[in-house]
Amino acid sequence: MKQDIGVCKSVSITCISETSWLDGDAWLKNVERAGGRNVDQWSVDWDEGNSGGYSSLIETEGLDGSSRKFLLDSGWNNAYMDAAFEREGIDAMLARREIEFLYVTHEHFDHYFGIASVLRHGPDITIMIPNTFHEKGHMLLKGARFPSSHAGNAFPHTGELVRHDPDIVYLLYPGCASVTFDLDVPFGV
């Protein structure tokens, strides 16, 4: 079924970090030691020295010349993501409220455990998540710590939390839409 989502004049994507882990072989050994891909990511003793994270800044220009920005995912290792956000000016954009929302694609460690790096600069930012988020994912957003996996957030989210049901097209704004899918993925999420 086709759905008209409107149009925008341009889209720009800035890759802040696409390095989920620094050494693939070391990451695979970490996964094997933990018991394989079906373990609960929240209980794995992840090698912090090998963690990076995924995050991108999406900027669109509307037909009227207006500009909008959102952040796609928050990365993994907070120290790594703090440096990446500072390098790209994301920290300042968050502090100035120039980034409209954070869109979390899924709660895997390399896309979500870096949530504190976003919230330290904008705890009230609107966050969009799949409606399939697990309880521990919500707990991290509220400020929980999971010492065994080195995941923690000292900056509880105070803004709006928008949940998207799977398989529904959500118009975010003209020319930009979202669809999430409920898939069987590894690491217990």
Feature locations, PLM:
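Pre-active-site segment of Zn-dependent metallo-hydrolases
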Residues: 45-52, 60-99
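Zn-dependent metallo-beta-lactamase
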Residues: 1-67, 177-178, 182-186
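Metallo-beta-lactamase
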Residues: 132-189
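Active-site metal-binding motif and surrounding structural segment of the metallo-beta-lactamase
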Residues: 79-135
